[in-house]
C-alpha cells in the first residue's frame, strides 16, 4: 500500500471516530443534582433531626427528618393528616395509613377521605328527637348525636335514611379491622355548624387531601345531620359557605363522613 493510500485511510478512520463520539455526546444525560435527589437542607437546618444523610455530590447538602416527621405529632392541627395510629403530620408519612384530615382542632374532628351522593331520607317524616331548626348554627349542632338520633328512629320505624346510614357504615378503604376507633360505627354525618367549620378550613383541608391522593371537597351542596322540618334538612354549599334547606329525598347532594378523635 502506498503512502497516499495509508494517509487517506487514516483520515477516514479519524473522521469516523469523531463522528461516533459527536453522536454519543448529543445523547448525554445531565447528571442529577443534590436538590433533585432530595438533599435540600443544610447542617444548621437539620439541627433537630434524628436521621440525616449527606449528599454524595456535595457534603454540605443534607436530607434529614425530625422525630415528629418520622412518628407523627400527637396533637392534630387544622389541615393535618390523621393516621390510623391516631398521630398527625403536615406532610405525608408514607409508612403510615392516612384515614382523614383535621378540620376542627378545638373539637377534635377530622373529615373522611371519601364522599358520595345520597338522599337524606327515603320519605318525608319528622324525627321527634331532632329539633326543627330555623338556625342551623345554634340548633342541633352535635353531628354525632344527630346521626345517632336519625339511625335509632329509622330502625325503630323501619325508615331509610341513606346519608346517615352511609356515614355510620363508613370505614376507610385501607382499614381491615372491625373493632377500631376509626372503623364502621365511629363516623357520623356532620351538623350544619360542623360543615360551616369545614368550609372555613376548606383550603387547608383540600391541600392535605391532595397530599394523600384523596377526593377533595368540591363546590357542591353537602348534607348535614341538622333537620329543618319534616320535609327539609339543612345543607351547606361548599363553594361559598351558603347554608340552606332542601327536600330530604333529594339524592344529588354530597355526603362526607366525619370522625371524632
Model feature map: region roles:
Residues 57, 192-261:
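C-terminal, surface-exposed recognition/capping segments
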Residues 1-11:
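Bacterial N-terminal signal peptides that target proteins for export
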Residues 186:
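Mobile, glycine-rich extracellular loop/lid and propeptide segments
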Residues 17, 112, 224-226:
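Short linear Ser/Thr-Pro motifs
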Residues 10-19:
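Bacterial N-terminal signal peptides
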Residues 25-183, 249-261:
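Short, compositionally biased
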Residues 111, 189-190:
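Short hydrophobic beta-strand that contains or immediately precedes a catalytic carboxylate
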Amino acid at each position: 500500500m502506498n503512502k497516499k493510500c495509508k494517509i487517506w485511510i487514516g483520515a477516514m478512520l479519524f473522521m469516523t471516530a469523531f463522528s461516533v463520539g459527536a453522536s454519543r455526546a448529543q445523547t448525554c444525560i445531565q447528571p442529577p443534582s443534590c436538590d433533585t435527589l432530595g438533599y435540600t437542607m443544610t447542617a444548621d437546618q437539620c439541627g433537630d433531626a434524628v436521621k440525616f444523610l449527606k449528599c454524595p455530590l456535595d457534603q454540605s447538602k443534607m436530607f434529614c427528618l425530625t422525630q415528629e416527621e418520622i412518628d407523627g405529632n400527637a396533637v392534630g392541627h387544622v389541615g393535618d393528616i390523621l393516621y390510623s395510629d391516631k398521630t398527625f403530620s403536615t406532610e405525608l408519612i408514607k409508612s403510615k395509613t392516612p384515614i382523614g384530615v383535621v378540620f376542627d382542632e378545638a373539637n377534635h374532628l377530622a373529615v373522611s377521605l371519601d364522599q358520595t351522593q345520597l338522599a337524606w331520607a327515603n320519605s318525608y317524616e319528622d324525627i321527634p328527637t331532632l329539633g326543627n331548626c330555623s338556625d342551623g348554627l345554634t340548633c342541633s349542632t352535635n353531628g354525632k348525636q344527630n346521626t345517632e338520633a336519625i339511625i335509632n328512629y329509622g330502625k325503630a320505624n323501619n325508615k331509610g335514611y341513606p346519608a346517615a346510614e352511609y356515614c355510620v357504615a363508613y370505614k376507610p378503604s385501607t382499614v381491615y379491622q372491625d373493632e377500631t376507633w376509626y372503623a364502621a360505627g365511629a363516623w357520623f354525618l356532620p351538623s350544619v355548624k360542623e360543615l360551616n367549620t369545614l368550609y372555613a378550613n376548606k383550603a387547608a383541608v383540600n391541600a392535605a387531601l391532595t397530599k394523600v391522593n384523596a377526593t377533595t371537597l368540591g363546590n357542591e351542596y353537602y348534607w348535614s345531620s341538622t333537620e329543618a322540618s319534616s320535609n327539609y334538612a339543612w345543607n351547606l354549599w361548599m363553594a361559598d359557605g351558603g347554608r340552606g334547606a332542601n327536600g330530604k329525598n333529594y339524592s344529588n347532594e354530597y355526603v362526607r363522613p366525619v370522625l371524632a378523635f
